[in-house]
Amino acid sequence: MSKYLITVLNANMTQKACPHRNAPPPGVNVYTKDNYSIYEIDGEKNKLYAQNLCLFAKLFLDTKSVFYDVTTFLYYLLVAHNPTPDIPITGLGEDGIGQQEQVVGFFSKEKMSWDNNNLACILVFPPWQKQGLGQILMGASYEMSKREGRLGGPEKRMHFQVLQRLPY
């Protein structure tokens, strides 16, 4: 199967046949509370998934520059259980009901940051923006960095609008 799909028909056929469409993201579930989980994905171990995630993010972030060389990054996906809004087109189960879990955003960070950065990219996908999910992602980034003894800040090249909203 090709990495990129040319037609909508191919995309629909792939979506229906894809064995991963109702599975949780690859990687390790590092946090679960209430209606949310955070999965850690290693860009080296799950290269294609990370590349596709970054290419998808590029649709919404003008400043997104890394989307092929993903092996030096860790990705943290925010997964909502029974999300609002539920977008059933993104994955219908066998019974035609929308999937119960949805990736709603993510952040990434370098595995080895010489500048002690704890955040390289952060994005809440448009249907789920303005629900405070960005704060969950930033809080998770901060807490992980604190536990690692690596208190730094975001990359300096982050978009100005994102920097305005950072609480630390």
Segments from the language model and where they lie:
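Non-catalytic substrate-recognition and accessory regions of acyl/acetyltransferase enzymes
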Residues: 1-129, 143-155, 168
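Glycine-rich acyl-CoA binding loop
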Residues: 130-139
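Cysteine-dependent PTP/DSP-like catalytic domain, specifically the C-terminal lobe
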Residues: 157-167
